[in-house]
Amino acid sequence: MYKRQIFDNKAMGFSYTRINNPTIEAFEKRITKLEEGFSSVACSSGMAAIFNSIANIVRQGDEVVASCGLYGGTVELFEDLESFGITVKYVADNKPECFEELITDKTRVVFAETIGNPKLDVTDIKAVADVAHAHGIPLIVDNTVSTPYLIQPITLGADVVVNSSSKYINGSSDAISGILTFNGKFKFDKEKYPGLKPYLKFGPMAYIIKLRNGLFRNTGGCLSPQNAFLNNLGLETLGLRMERHCSNAYELARYLDTFEGITVNYPGLESSPYHEVADKQFTKGYGAIITFRVGSKERAFKIINALKIPNIVSNIGDTKTLVIHPASTIALHLSDKDKEASGVYDDLIRVSVGIEDIDDLKEDFRAVLESTDNE
């Protein structure tokens, strides 16, 4: 029977929506092409995509080397991994040599973000990929903040790319979703990755087939077809939106940088310690997230509450400008040490810049910053 061949991985087809689905596949194929990858698996959220990408190839006793400044949710996920006997080590700095220092014979994954959130640190993907590959280890990169519009990590050496497609890919905050994309080129050593050994006969599809027929299927972290449909709609305007997002963010960052009493962090500013790497990797913009410190937690709250255009929301990537106080929201449960490593401070405000008229945004921030200047 043809259906049996599908279940036995001897024929292509759809077996069950928890594993695959035509609408979801259409979304996966689009992302695969945008990321210049080989194959993708869409998940219920960005966190599910990160978990599946790593858990597919690690087991108890293995180690993960991760970049500093990771998104708080990812840090908390990695704490959960440690409860399964998987050790996560964080580099002190995202320089390639810092990754090299932490890699041991137990390391099975190197993990990084193209742009950290909210630290906004930028990883040199090619340099870190070279370090990982020298040890026979895949590099997994979270491309959520950049999107494939700004950078395609696979072309720089990344082996797996994850996106929280709830953000810029969707663009309207109407669907929680995530997706991982494999390059189809990384050669997994059967001794180092014994869980993949039975699947190596599938060649470049080994990583994906193992995932679909194991962890992904059995944990139920699949994307709903409706959310895949909404993401497909979002993809149709991704390029236009990202162009406006990035130009607005660059202009707003430069404008905010003229105010005394605040410190602006944005990779597009020459004052950013990551500007040189960002300039090398990004050709169409520096992303659409800005953070700035205002001197005190009290002033940060006053500014956030007084702004008229932005919504106070913990999400990023919406067409609308969004502001949040990370220390009391998305990073609330992190330790003080982890907050500092993630670039989170009590007086920090994060802005996900939308596609509104830039002059309107400037005027809104000007009025609020000036009114709170002496408070």
Residue ranges and their predicted role:
Residues S40-F259, N265:
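Conserved PLP-enzyme active-site core in the AAT-like
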Residues M12, I176, N227, N231, ...:
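Short amphipathic alpha-helical segments
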Residues F38, E79-D80, T87-K89, E101, ...:
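PLP-dependent enzyme catalytic core of the Aspartate aminotransferase-like
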Residues K3-F51, G73-D80:
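Conserved N-terminal alpha-helix of the aminotransferase class I/II PLP-enzyme fold
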Residues D257, T263-I349, V353:
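Conserved C-terminal alpha-helix-loop-beta "cap" of PLP-dependent enzymes
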Residues V131, E251, Y255-F259, K302, ...:
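Generic non-transmembrane alpha-helical segments
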Residues L34-E35, E82, S173-D174, K284-Y286, ...:
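Short glycine-enriched loop/turn motifs at secondary-structure junctions
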